[in-house]
């Protein structure tokens, strides 16, 4: 996910590896000459933080919640090995921590990018990202059209986190899901709650 602001670009989710981050940066250059100055690690898993090293190398600041930074510190090597079990070609990446952390919710791009933490879900630390001007919610790995990988999910808290999201009454018309088909309407929240209910029965 990419947000092109007035003066610079914010990348939401650092991608899987330095190479995928480089490819994304090249695609961004085809859209805008504005520099990438901020990258949000939206959770501590490699698909959201694996490209940190590349983005740092081009001068971007890596940003996350303190919880994400703490989980990266504690579990990064373990998570790389976990990915390699399913994808043996995945590189052994060193830990690259965020440059700046927040205790909870935070805003970037003058309020155009709002990171929201509502509790455990797909991971203990996953955040939503809300773009109020565009009326778009990025669902991260938390919202998608299939249950997906729940190995690190808190199944008892996951529905509560989604209910808290609903209670915010954010003004969005589009949800960008973290995996599979990306574009959905607000109904994706209830659809995913129904999927979770089938898992927790």
Features from the language model and the residues they span:
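Mature N-terminal segment immediately following signal peptide/propeptide cleavage
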Residues: 1-5
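Active-site metal-binding motif and surrounding structural segment of the metallo-beta-lactamase
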Residues: 6-8, 19-63, 169-171
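Metallo-beta-lactamase
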Residues: 8-10, 16-17, 70-192
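Extracytoplasmic/secreted cell-surface and envelope-processing proteins
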Residues: 20-21, 47-50, 71-73, 147-148, ...
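Solvent-exposed, polar/charged alpha-helical surfaces in well-ordered, non-transmembrane soluble domains
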Residues: 22, 26, 30, 53, ...
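Generic beta-sheet signal
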Residues: 64-65, 139
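Extracytoplasmic/periplasmic copper-protein system
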Residues: 69-70, 195-199
């Amino acid at each position: 996910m990419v947000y092109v602001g007035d003066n610079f670009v914010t990348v939401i989710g650092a991608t899987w590896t330095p190479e995928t981050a480089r490819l994304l940066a090249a695609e961004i250059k085809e859209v805008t000459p504005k520099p990438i100055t901020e990258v949000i690690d939206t959770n501590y898993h490699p698909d959201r933080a694996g490209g940190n090293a590349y983005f740092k190398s081009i001068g971007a600041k890596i940003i996350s919640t303190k919880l994400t930074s703490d989980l990266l510190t504690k579990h990064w090597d373990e998570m790389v090995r976990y990915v390699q079990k399913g994808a043996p070609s995945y590189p052994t990446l060193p830990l690259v921590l965020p440059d700046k952390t927040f205790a909870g919710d935070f805003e970037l791009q003058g309020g155009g990018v709002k990171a929201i933490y509502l509790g455990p879900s797909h991971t203990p630390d996953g955040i939503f990202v809300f773009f109020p001007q565009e009326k778009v919610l990025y669902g991260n790995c938390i919202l998608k059209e299939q249950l997906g990988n729940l190995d690190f999910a808190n199944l008892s808290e996951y529905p509560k986190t989604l209910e808290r999201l609903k209670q915010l009454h954010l003004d969005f018309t589009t949800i960008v899901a973290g995996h599979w088909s990306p574009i959905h309407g607000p109904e994706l929240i209830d659809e995913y709650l129904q999927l979770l209910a089938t898992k927790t029965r």
